[in-house]
Design a protein with these regions (language model features):
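Acidic (Asp/Glu) and glycine-rich low-complexity loops/linkers
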Residues: 1-60, 64-156, 162-175, 181-194, ...
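Structural signature of tandem-repeat unit edges
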Residues: 163, 240, 259, 279-280
């Protein structure tokens, strides 16, 4: 037993010494600067792109990627990157392709320490492009406003996505870990999928909306969905304020749902296993709310025919006629008033 314990402690000591050595080596290669500006392992580049293109594909391993409108009418790519992962730029068949070339040695692969952040910033001179496709592993992504894209597809492993532009036909964002923020005046079909992270939509107009997440909060403010909106989640709250849609559906397992000034032309439904549902001045052609554990309370703007059921909980709803409002809870009170 003592021999096993001694061997374990020896292995731990070796691991600590190895990590300390990697730390010192990386700091030395960064010119003994924690901001990495003096590092010999990094390089700053600036490249002007003169060929014409209508589509853009970006696949880099920099920490941060930004796509911005060009203020001087010049298409330009600025990067600060590791020398072992340089980028390449080419225009083929009307498509601008920006990608990295993997040249990592063993040290770069096993070293966990990084004292500087790399980035790539693309400045676009036009105000409309057919497609923007971005593949990114780790780092934040910004797509600034001022440019229209017909179609946008973003795939990110770890990092935050901020999309402030317009995707006229469709917008698809897929992330594993990180927050997603969207502000768009005119976007078509919007599909957002994330495993862990918050999703926020503000001051936006989309044709349709499909949100799917496992863990995280959904917040929508001043949002217009011209057709159907679907929000699916496992754990996390949903907060909607000043939202309109043709049909609105919220389905999740755990988390509170708060709706303020939310309107659906045809059908509005909420399905929740655990969590409160709070309504403040909402309305729809038909309303369906079903929860297992959690109360349903608030106000509806117009009179409804209430069909309510609670296995364990107090019920207090108006005796009015109108379109159907069906509310069911297993454990939780139901209290609804008409008016704001």
């Amino acid at each position: 037993m003592r021999t096993v314990a001694r061997g374990f402690f020896i292995l731990c000591a070796i691991a600590v010494i190895a990590l300390a050595a990697l730390f010192v080596i990386e700091l030395w290669q960064c010119g003994w600067s924690f901001d990495g500006k003096n590092s010999k392992n990094y390089t700053h580049t600036e490249q002007v792109i003169t060929e014409d293109f209508t589509k853009i594909i970006i696949n880099l391993k920099t920490d941060d990627i930004s796509v911005l409108p060009s203020e001087d009418g010049e298409c330009r790519l600025e990067t600060f990157e590791r020398k072992t992962m340089p980028h390449t730029v080419k225009v083929e068949d009307g498509t601008l392709v920006i990608s990295f070339t993997e040249k990592d040695d063993l040290y770069s692969r096993i070293n966990p320490f990084r004292f500087t952040s790399t980035y790539a910033t693309l400045y676009l001179p036009g105000n409309y492009y057919d497609a923007l496709t971005i593949g990114h592993k780790t780092g934040d992504l910004l797509v600034e406003n001022g440019i229209y894209y017909d179609s946008v597809a973003i795939a990110l492993s770890t990092g935050d996505v901020t999309f402030l532009a317009d995707a006229i036909k469709d917008l698809e964002i897929t992330t594993t870990t990180g927050d997603v923020r969207i502000v768009s005046d005119k976007t078509g079909e919007a599909r957002i999928t994330t495993t862990t992270g918050d999703i926020t939509l503000t001051d936006s107009v989309v044709t349709s909306l499909d949100i799917s997440l496992s863990t995280g909060e959904v917040t929508a403010t001043n949002l217009t969905v011209l057709s159907d909106a679907l929000i699916k989640g496992t754990t996390g709250s949903s907060t909607l304020k000043d939202v309109t849609a043709r049909n609105l559906s919220i389905k999740k397992s755990t988390g509170n749902t708060t709706l303020d000034d939310v309107y659906a032309d045809e059908r509005f439904e909420v399905e929740s296993t655990s969590g409160r549902v709070t309504l403040d001045g909402i309305d729809a052609g038909e309303i369906f709310i079903k929860t297992t554990t959690g109360s349903v309370k608030g106000s509806i703007l117009s009179e409804k025919q209430f069909l309510v059921k609670s296995t364990s909980g107090r019920i207090d709803v108006p005796s009015t006629a109108g379109p159907i409002c069906k509310i069911e809870t297993t454990t939780g009170a139901i209290k609804i008033i008409i008016g704001n």
